């Protein structure tokens, strides 16, 4: 770990950030596992990792990370998130949204892209807060580091 912090903080932090941002929740603990079994000669970073986060209120969030897929692999670079609750579920994948609830299956239009850099500059110039705060970024970073520690030790890590 002196030269590579781990695949969870490097690749998984983005999904961790989404989970925190979209749920508005907080993590209470994490368990994780990882493998470098597919790495060439065993000398490479972890190629896959899984993390299970427990959240305040009892919700669970799972994270799957993979690395070193071939560039032509159909899932290379794909990102997705799925949230399931008592009134339905929403899934974002392949640049589209699927909402399933009591009204059936819907495919709402995507929201326009948010330019987070412009958002950041606006905060500097006007003081209007960014959509994402520094505290939220630090929370995601802490969660990624703790998830990597859980994967490295095989222990459940409490927040």
Predicted regions and their residues:
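Predominantly a Rossmann-like dinucleotide-binding segment in NAD(P)-dependent oxidoreductases
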Residues: 1-43, 154
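Residue-level signal for the nucleotide or nucleotide-sugar donor/cofactor binding architecture
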Residues: 10, 78, 132
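NAD(P)-dinucleotide binding in Rossmann-like oxidoreductases
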Residues: 40-46, 55-117
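A structural signal for well-ordered alpha-helical segments within the folded catalytic domains
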Residues: 13-17, 114-118, 135-142
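Active-site rim elements
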Residues: 4-7, 105, 126-131
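Short beta-strand scaffold segments in enzyme catalytic cores
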Residues: 51-53
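C-terminal helix-rich "cap/oligomerization" subdomain common to oxidoreductases
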Residues: 56, 122-159
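Short glycine/threonine-rich loop-to-helix capping motif typified by GTGT followed
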Residues: 44-49, 149
């Amino acid at each position: 770990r002196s030269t590579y912090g781990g695949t969870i903080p490097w690749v998984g932090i983005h999904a961790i950030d989404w989970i925190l941002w979209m749920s508005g929740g907080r993590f209470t603990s994490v368990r994780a596992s990882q493998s470098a079994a597919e790495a060439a000669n065993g000398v490479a970073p972890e190629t896959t990792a899984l993390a299970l986060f427990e959240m305040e209120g009892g919700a669970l969030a799972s994270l799957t990370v993979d690395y070193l897929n071939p560039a032509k692999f159909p899932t290379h670079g794909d990102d997705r998130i799925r949230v399931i609750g008592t009134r339905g579920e929403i899934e974002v994948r392949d640049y589209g949204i699927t909402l399933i609830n009591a009204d059936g299956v819907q495919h709402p239009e995507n929201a326009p892209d948010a330019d987070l850099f412009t958002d950041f500059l606006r905060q500097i110039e006007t003081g209007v807060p960014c959509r994402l705060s520094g505290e939220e970024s630090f929370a995601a970073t802490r969660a990624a580091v703790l998830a990597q520690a859980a994967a490295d030790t095989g222990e459940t890590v409490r927040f």
